[in-house]
Amino acid sequence: MALPLLQYKPSSQNHRVTSFGAADQNEDTPYIYRIEDVSSYTDIQNIIWASYRQVFSEHEILKFNRQKTLESQVKNGSISVRDFIRGLAKSEAFYRLVVSVNNNYRLVDITLKRLLGRSSYNKDEQIAWSIVIGTKGFSGFVDALIDSEEYTKNFGENIVPYQRKRMEGRPHNLVTPRYGEDFQEKAGTVQTDWRFTLDKFYSRKSQEKQLREGDPRKFADLAASVGNQGNYAQRISAFDIDYLNAVPNRSRR
């Protein structure tokens, strides 16, 4: 028997504020992709790529992450946009890139942002959904979100999820990398290569080492700055010197 979802209290977020209509429209207002607006091949392609951007995040759209079977099904109308989003979130690529590299709490927050268009309300909500992941698996968690009343009310069958009422700050996909700090050491992003560290340390120490007075190495920079132009002795004959003009005439006042 599956455990019921634990109760949690929603916190204040922009998407919970009643819309003021046109007053809410600004440069941050997202473009809403609807299947009803499709009138050409380009339009359906835009919906597909908007779905990839939302689910996989902007910096994770690569050719080998494409789900061509799902793309074909949504193009010919076999599945709705809702099921296309569901399929992307359950794909092996999403599991490899996002699910496998996060703990359950962070995974809940990321998935809420990408499927429901909002951040988790608080730690209580993260705990509640983490229990769902523990009992039903990630696939069951995705179904719970996609089939939820919140998803149905905001996106229905034919709208690509988007960040709801982003009035300030940057988009979720730019501030939420696919894995957190606890996975960085495993990924090797913070591991130190001691070979380069020691080489850099001893190079700096060599430069800062104090030399004794009179050590020629102290004058290496000075010697290098001296020009290489030769100053050779001039050859001149005594007969070439005009002594009469060279000696001042002291008889004149």
Curated annotation (Swiss-Prot):
Gene3D superfamilies (UniProt xref): Phycobilisome linker domain
Domain PBS-linker: 11-191
Topological category with respect to the lipid bilayer: Peripheral membrane protein
Keyword list, A-Z: Antenna complex, Membrane, Photosynthesis, Phycobilisome, Thylakoid
Short name of one Pfam family: PBS_linker_poly
Assembly and oligomerization: Part of the phycobilisome, a hemidiscoidal structure that is composed of two distinct substructures: a core complex and a number of rods radiating from the core.
Name of the protein in question: Phycobilisome rod-core linker polypeptide CpcG4
Encoding gene (name): cpcG4
